[in-house]
């Protein structure tokens, strides 16, 4: 199970279950998720929305040796999305405009990892094909996109150094549910989860972690940066931030992460009702 709650009315939660199939190491899984948001970005209207989704996915080992693993990943998602604009301008307050959309999305790709002395790398490359209906001429129909993630860690005694990169490219304008977002706990942490959206984009992080002397607890310092662009706009948006945090890992059980991040160049928040100089994030989950 997973979940996220921000102090600006963005909520994401879901559950999934997976199990081994056959004898080759293949695992199949099913999942359910729901997200909602309530954003006040201007004085004319509030943006509200809700998305519910069901997913099926699989992971099949392709290659494995002592240091390398390569896995084929594939799946299907069915999503129902409802967007609302709640007008608040004089004379129009209380009026809502509603759009209901449906998406069927398929994906296939590879993920892998490599273990070397004092080094670890993890990567993925995934192709997505989807069809959206109900969103209007600019976004309805077929779309294609490619996503990739890379993590590289170097261990040096009590210290480790991490570099992480996430990239998305797409062939056309995308619905908000498929866009790439710069802000959030897995992006530029100095900005909110819906900040900086587009069809094409990247985020990059450099992080240093140091053992504190308390078992499982590390202190961290990091820099995040990213850029994003939409097909229907010439502007490229850049966001950057820096921060500090704590990481706690109990072997194969609990994981907790606390971060406080501040902006670099202090670009104003656009999707939150007030501007903030930084954000705090907390994540907790348990492995079963």
Predicted features, each with a name:
Residues 39, 75, 79, 84-96, ...:
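Outer membrane beta-barrel transmembrane domains
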Residues 3-13, 49, 135-140, 196-200, ...:
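Solvent-exposed loop/turn segments connecting transmembrane beta-strands
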Residues 21, 156, 197, 249-251, ...:
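Surface-exposed coil/turn segments at beta-strand junctions on protein surfaces, enriched
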Residues 11-15, 52-56, 104-110, 144-150, ...:
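Hydrophobic, lipid-facing positions within transmembrane beta-strands of outer-membrane proteins
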Residues 1-27, 64, 200:
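Outer-membrane beta-barrel initiation region
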Residues 1-7, 13-15, 30-36, 125-135, ...:
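Transmembrane beta-strand segments that form the barrel wall of outer-membrane beta-barrel proteins
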Residues 246-256, 260, 275-288:
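Outer-membrane beta-barrel "beta-signal"
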Residues 20, 25-163, 168-172:
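Transmembrane beta-strand segments of outer-membrane beta-barrel domains in Gram-negative
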């Amino acid at each position: 199970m997973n979940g996220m709650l921000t102090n600006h009315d963005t909520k994401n939660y879901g559950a999934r279950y997976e199990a081994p199939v056959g004898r080759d190491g293949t695992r199949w899984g099913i999942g359910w998720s729901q997200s909602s948001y309530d954003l006040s970005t201007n004085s004319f209207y509030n943006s509200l929305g809700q998305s519910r989704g069901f997913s099926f996915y699989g992971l099949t080992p392709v290659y494995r040796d002592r240091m390398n693993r390569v896995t084929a990943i594939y799946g299907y998602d069915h999503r129902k999305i409802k967007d609302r604009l709640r007008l608040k301008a004089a004379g129009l307050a209380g009026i809502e405009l509603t759009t209901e959309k449906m998406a069927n999305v398929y994906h296939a790709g590879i993920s892998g990892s490599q273990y070397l002395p004092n080094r670890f790398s993890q990567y993925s490359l995934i192709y997505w094909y989807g069809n959206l209906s109900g969103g209007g001429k600019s976004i309805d129909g077929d779309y294609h996109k490619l996503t990739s993630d890379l993590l590289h860690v170097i261990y040096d005694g009590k210290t480790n150094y991490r570099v992480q990169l996430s990239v998305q490219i797409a062939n056309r304008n995308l619905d908000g549910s498929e866009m790439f977002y710069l802000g959030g706990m897995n992006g530029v942490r100095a900005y909110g989860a819906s900040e900086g959206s587009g069809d094409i984009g990247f985020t990059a992080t450099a992080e240093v972690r140091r053992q504190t002397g308390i078992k499982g607890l590390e202190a961290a310092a990091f820099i995040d940066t990213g850029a994003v662009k939409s097909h229907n706009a010439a502007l490229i948006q850049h966001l950057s931030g820096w921060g500090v945090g704590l990481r706690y890992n109990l072997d194969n059980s609990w994981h907790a992460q606390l971060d406080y991040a501040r902006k670099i160049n202090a670009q104003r928040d656009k999707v939150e009702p007030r501007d903030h100089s930084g954000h705090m994030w907390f994540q907790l989950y348990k492995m079963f």
